[in-house]
Amino acid sequence: MTTKHDVKTFQGFIMTLQEYWAQQGCAIVQPLDMEVGAGTFHPMTFLRSLGPEPMSSAYVQPSRRPTDGRYGENPNRLQHYYQFQVVLKPSPSNMQELYLGSLEALGVDMNVHDVRFVEDNWESPTLGAWGLGWEIWLNGMEVSQFTYFQQVGGLECKPVTGEITYGLERLAMYIQEVDSVYDLVWTDGPLGKVMYGDIFHQNEVEQSTYNFEHADVDVQFKMFDDCEQACQRLLALEKPLPLPAYEQVMKASHAFNLLDARHAISVTERQRYILRVRTMAKGVAEAYYQAREALGFPMCK
């Protein structure tokens, strides 16, 4: 595939992936407008993996992991970063070839570079999800994750959904041949180069300070409890509302992550909180499946 985008910029790199996967039949959807720890939390992955309805999509997802912040001092550890998520349901038999084709679209020559699939089964305890998977290494560095979902929200995936997750910054650093994420060229236009650091370095410094030092522990504990109660209430309605309930799951999960960054939760409590999120996610998954079933699984027609 030829592309008109400059893959030596972060902007062009993302646009190339979007164009490639659009040509493979994916709906290019937009990022979720909430704090999530990974692209898997997006409803297009978590909820659309449930039930028999086919769906292929791809999207960029800003992801937040408060404990990974380093005050902007580490060249490759960030509390806010980007994933590119591809969801293929049912999973095609040539998923590996499609992925390699995306690397070629980004200018990675398979005859020159060493691409390896290293077995690494995936699990998300908070989402009650797991799958058979592989890390994808490019010249010895992990750049993507490849997963065949077996279970989501405690429900078996029929058919199996295939997921590809690209670590955008890490792969872009390789393509641009830079050692620091802040040295990535975001775009190069009439006003000159705009660097990743120009856009995000101050955010990393300030958000790390907030996550580790100023996030109000009492507020976050209350937020978690309030979200849990709201989720339970929405699922207990005569006609449950799984989509709004799922938003409460994501809010509770982020509150938990902030409490984790503040070291406000003991090891024992940590497992209890993870179980509480998983219980919410399982309730949402069951309600969503039942709602789609009541509609007659319309996308199967």
From Swiss-Prot:
GO molecular function: ATP binding; glycine-tRNA ligase activity
InterPro entries reported in the protein's UniProt record: aa-tRNA-synth_II/BPL/LPL (IPR045864), Gly-tRNA-synth_heterodimer (IPR006194), Gly-tRNA_ligase_asu (IPR002310)
Main location: cytoplasm
Domain of life: Bacteria
Keywords, ordered alphabetically: Aminoacyl-tRNA synthetase, ATP-binding, Cytoplasm, Ligase, Nucleotide-binding, Protein biosynthesis
A GO cellular component entry from the record: cytosol
UniProt cross-references to CDD domains, sorted A to Z: GlyRS_alpha_core (cd00733)
GO biological process, one term: glycyl-tRNA aminoacylation
Subcellular location: Cytoplasm
Catalytic activity: tRNA(Gly) + glycine + ATP = glycyl-tRNA(Gly) + AMP + diphosphate
SUPFAM superfamilies noted in UniProt: Class II aaRS and biotin synthetases
Listed EC numbers: 6.1.1.14
Homology family: Belongs to the class-II aminoacyl-tRNA synthetase family.
Subunit structure of this chain's protein: Tetramer of two alpha and two beta subunits.
Entries under PANTHER family matching the protein: GLYCINE--TRNA LIGASE, CHLOROPLASTIC_MITOCHONDRIAL 2, GLYCYL-TRNA SYNTHETASE
Protein name: Glycine--tRNA ligase alpha subunit
